Amino acid sequence: MCGAIRYEVSARPITMFNCHCRDCQRTTVGAFTPVVYVPAKAFKITKGSPRYYSTPSEMVGHNRRGFCPECGSRLFGGETERGQGITASSLDDPSLFKPKVNMWISDAQPWDHMDPNLPKFEKYPPQR
């Protein structure tokens, strides 16, 4: 948001999704987190030093979320050996975000009105 932290991604996203898990609801203070999931090796911080906050997470075991120490914006989280989740609203052009699925709808709030055209999964989509 403020530009104190910058990152780049050198590969196409693995996928894009809306995560409705309780962890995402709490950290965004909203219904879900819009996530761009990219290959871990393609993600690089190019400016600044993010702060991190970690919590236990049913989704990834332990979720380490990076945020800007200046403005507090959540930037990324859910890092695994395979990939890195990036909060879509932190992209330079958030209109590039095109979610493929809604996941963890088992935790979705009753007031959360999801796009009826997107597939919905109680937890994770089946692995291909």
Report the location of each language-model feature.
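A short Gly-Trp-Pro
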Residues: M1-R128
